[in-house]
Amino acid sequence: MLYKNNLLILLIISMFTFFEKVDAKYEKLFFDHSIKNINNETIDLNQYKGKTILLVNVASKCGFTKQYTGLQDLYEKYKDRGFYVIGVPSNQFGGQEPGSNSEIKDFCETNFNITFPITDKTDVKGEDAHDLYK
């Protein structure tokens, strides 16, 4: 019995010997961020806490541009149940979103009757990526 106790104590001491203190760094959660909408107004993502968000990269000159129709349908069908779509236009995927914010807004409203929130054109990768994507 003494042998087992000593072995257990040795095991516990060994475990803590290999642990290293690590300073915890506060990481922002999704809902701690804000992002500008297509009209340059702030979208506080905290307003969506407790809801389901589909944050989707979009582009008007992309092979998937027709996805706007499906995204709008999803938004309309489920927004009253707490499901929201937020479109994030970016020109960082093969230059497929070259337009200005006003051109993007006009394109989305004219061609797809988009009513879900769309952000301003946003960098989503690289050094200048929006904090939400880091």
Q: Model-derived features: where do they sit?
A:
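N-terminal "domain-start" segment that seeds a small globular fold
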Residues: 22-46, 131-134
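Bacterial N-terminal signal peptides that target proteins for export
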Residues: 1-8
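Aromatic (phenylalanine/tyrosine) cluster motif
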Residues: 3, 16-19
